[in-house]
Swiss-Prot record:
It holds the Pfam family Ribosomal_S16. InterPro entries: Ribosomal_bS16 (IPR000307), Ribosomal_bS16_dom_sf (IPR023803). Keywords: Ribonucleoprotein, Ribosomal protein. Belongs to the bacterial ribosomal protein bS16 family. It comes from the Bacteria. NCBIfam families: S16. This is Small ribosomal subunit protein bS16. It comes from Rhizobium meliloti (strain 1021). The keyword Ribonucleoprotein applies. Residues 114-124 have a biased composition (Low complexity). The gene is rpsP. GO terms for molecular function: structural constituent of ribosome.
Length: 124
């Protein structure tokens, strides 16, 4: 049985509240779980101590049993010092293509030349 430490959504519409639970990976998001490990209330201020509550001892127990935390829960565990979050791969997909980069460099160069010409004209 593959175990996950994940968030189960509660609360009402537009007022989210999450329980941090250990559940079988195949069970529904808000379905049956084995144990509640804590809670996360995203409506509270980021510096509020009750925003994220974790039972550190039980979290360590379930990780030792092989439970895999999800990305968001891993962030919480990293903040609490219970686990180390690995560095993420940051692909360069968001960069423009070669032609667009060349055009941007040319435009920047023209702007610099125009600024230099304007400063020379103002100096005379």
């Amino acid at each position: 049985m593959a175990l996950k430490i994940r968030l189960a959504r509660g609360g009402s519409k537009k007022r989210p509240y999450y329980q941090i639970v250990v559940a079988d990976a195949r069970s529904p998001r808000d379905g049956r779980f084995l144990e509640k490990l804590g809670s996360w209330n995203p409506m509270l201020a980021k510096d509020d101590e009750k925003r994220i509550e974790l039972n550190a001892e039980r979290v360590q127990h379930w990780i030792a049993q092989g439970a895999q935390p999800t990305d968001r829960v891993m962030r919480f565990l990293d903040q609490a010092g219970l686990a180390k979050r690995p560095a993420r791969n940051n692909p360069t997909k968001a960069q423009p293509g070669k032609k667009a980069q060349e055009r941007a460099a040319e435009a920047k160069q023209k702007a610099e030349e125009a600024a230099a010409a304007a400063s020379e004209a103002a100096a005379e």
